Structure formats: C-alpha cells, structure tokens
C-alpha cells in the first residue's frame, strides 16, 4: 500500500530554522518553544492534499547504480530487499507492504519495529557477504534490490529469473539517485520527489542558519575503534560538510574506514571527535584515553556520538540528513539549536515512517 504524501511537517521545520537565521537567539528557550509549536502538530493537522501521481508506464527500462540497464516488465507487486539502505528507503516510499523478503537481522532494526514491524518476521535473503540466492528466488519477487557489492552475484540471480536493481548511495547525490531509481521502479515517483525535496529543504535551511560561521575541524571515528576514520570518499564526509565542519582526515585516500595512529590524530588535532552511530565504544572511553589527552577535542570535552536510538544516521539512508542537523547543533550551537534537531526528527519520522521518536540520541 502506497502511503499518503505529506510534507507540511518538514516544511514547517525548515521554515522555523530559516526564520531563526544565524543568531544566538535560536538556542533560547523561547525560540525553541516557538520552533516546537511550528512542527509538532499532529499528522491530522499537518495533512495536505496528496501530490498528483506521476504515472509510470511499463515495461520500464531504468539504469541502476552499477550502470546496468534493467527492464521491469510490469509494475512490481512483490519486492525483496537485501540491503538495509534500500529497505529503509522502500518504507519511506510507502511500499513496505509489498516486501516479501528482507536483509538478515531485520528483527534487530529499531526503525523497522517502530515503522513496519511486520518486516521483522519476513524471510531473510542474507547479507552482502552471504546472499541467499535460492532463498530469494523461492520467494518469487517481482523485483529484487541489492547493494552494489553484490554485483558479481547479479548474473546468477538473473539466471534464476530475478529482475535485479543495484544501489550504491555513497554520497548525497547518489542517495538522491537511489531515491529516484526506486521511486520510478515502484511507481512512487511523486512520493520520491517529496522525499528528496524534504531532505533538500532541511539541508538548505541548515546551511543558511550556519552561514559563514567558522568551520571547526572534525575527526569522524569509526564503528570498531577511535583509530578508524572516514576520509573524503565516504558518506560521513558529506555529513561533516553539511554541518559546517572540515574533515580532519581530508587527506586520507582510503575509500572505506582508514586505520590511523594516535600520532596522526594528535597531528591533525581536531576541534571535535565524533563517534559513529554504531560505535562499539563510548564517549567516556575516548575522553579518558591517555593517548589522546593532548588532543584539543578531548581537552575541550568536544567528543560526541552520532544518534543511534532509531537508526545509524551516518549511513546513506533517507534520514541521514538528521545526522547533519545533529552535527550542526554540536558544531554551531549558537546557530542551530538542539531543539531544531528534535523537531526535524519528529517531522521526518512522523511523515515518512509513521511514528514520533521517543528518543533522539
């Protein structure tokens, strides 16, 4: 079932931040209250007329994010997603009811339990490392969406009669490309356009609020260790830039998490250390790490972890812009209030996932 289109909540949030501009008043209790009143209306109050449907004609030929031309013969009624990123996106597009199989460990995803709990009992079709070809084929989905990492397995999937799209949303533009691709494939183009506009509007408001504030240096630490960091080729780099920061690891050439030394971190001497959403260590362990005692971020107490209560916002999911908003509130608290981050999260998850967050961290 395709969800009703609503953007009023997100537009209200964007307007609220824009109105605050780049003044310190945005962080005041009164301003926060005013922003909250703009964006915490109930879904019924915020409902707007559904956007006009943009018809898709089948057979439809699209180009996926591996550059493959794929023809979808008829509108897909059953879907299988082997990737958390695509599953999250399909929920935002309102086609979760059409899913018949999802990636492994879906039962552990808080986002699913809050927005589409039925997905947690669907058959697993594996992971990017261990994809279950035969299990997926047995579900006879009309369309399968997989990560680009599975490119070598796609010919085998096609031999089993599956129609397959690969996604690789490794930067902001490619995230928009993935939204376009799946919206077109699932005949939810209008919904996809609204979703992109909501993300773009909020990022624009964030940029306008930050304005020409001085950009601090940010060290983005990885999931497994504080000595892992994200270079300019990773999605996290775009989050730092969106939040008005400079990536301390801008010189790193690795396309995945790079291993670095304590000496290198101290040489970069970042103003802030930000832990990945799914880090298996905590802020206190970094603050108490004697090897980092001379780092400016540690001395100033500027060590934070990205939100993870709902999902990892440093993954290229639709809600990843919230990671930028949160980071903006950390780096530029006089321009971007924590309340605005909360309001954006409320608006986004209510509109596109059907729930209001109980926790924001």
Sequence positions of predicted segments:
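Hydrophobic core
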Residues: 15-19
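Extracytoplasmic substrate-binding proteins
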Residues: 50, 54, 62, 69-71, ...
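Alpha-helical, coiled-coil/dimerization segments enriched in small aliphatic residues
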Residues: 229-257, 261
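Bacterial N-terminal signal peptides that target proteins for export
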Residues: 1-7
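Bacterial lipoprotein signal-peptidase II cleavage site
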Residues: 20-30
């Amino acid at each position: 079932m395709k969800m009703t289109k609503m953007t009023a909540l997100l537009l209200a949030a964007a307007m609220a931040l824009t109105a605050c501009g780049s003044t310190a008043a945005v962080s005041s209790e009164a301003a926060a209250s005013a922003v909250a009143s703009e964006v915490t209306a109930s879904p019924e109050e915020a409902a707007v007329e559904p956007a006009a449907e943009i018809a898709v004609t089948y057979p439809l030929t699209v180009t996926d994010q591996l550059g493959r031309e794929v023809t979808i013969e008829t509108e897909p009624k059953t879907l299988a997603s082997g990737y958390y990123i695509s599953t999250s996106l399909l929920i935002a597009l309102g086609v979760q009811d059409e899913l018949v199989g999802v990636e492994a460990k879906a039962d552990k995803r808080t986002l699913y339990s809050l927005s589409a709990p039925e997905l947690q009992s669907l058959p697993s079709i594996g992971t990017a490392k261990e994809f279950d070809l035969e299990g997926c084929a047995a579900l006879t989905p009309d369309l399968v969406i997989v990560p680009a990492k599975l490119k070598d397995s796609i010919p085998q999937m096609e031999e089993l009669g599956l129609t397959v799209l690969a996604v690789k949303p490794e930067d902001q533009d490619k995230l928009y490309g993935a939204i376009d691709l799946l919206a077109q494939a699932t005949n939810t183009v209008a919904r996809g356009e609204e979703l992109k506009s909501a993300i773009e509007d909020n990022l624009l408001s964030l940029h306008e609020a930050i304005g020409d504030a001085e950009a601090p240096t940010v060290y983005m630490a990885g999931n497994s260790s504080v000595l892992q960091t994200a270079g300019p080729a990773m999605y996290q780099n775009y989050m730092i830039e969106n939040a008005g920061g400079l990536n301390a690891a801008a010189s790193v050439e690795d396309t995945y998490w790079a291993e670095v030394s304590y000496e290198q971190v101290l040489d970069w001497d970042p103003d802030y250390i930000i832990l990945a959403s799914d880090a298996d260590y905590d802020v206190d362990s970094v603050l108490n790490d004697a090897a980092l005692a001379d780092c400016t971020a540690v001395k100033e107490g500027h060590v934070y972890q990205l939100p993870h209560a709902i999902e990892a916002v440093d993954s290229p999911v639709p809600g990843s812009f919230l990671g930028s908003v949160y980071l903006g509130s950390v780096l530029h608290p006089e321009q971007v209030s924590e309340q605005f981050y909360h309001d954006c999260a409320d608006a986004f998850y209510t509109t596109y996932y059907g729930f209001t967050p109980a926790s924001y961290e």
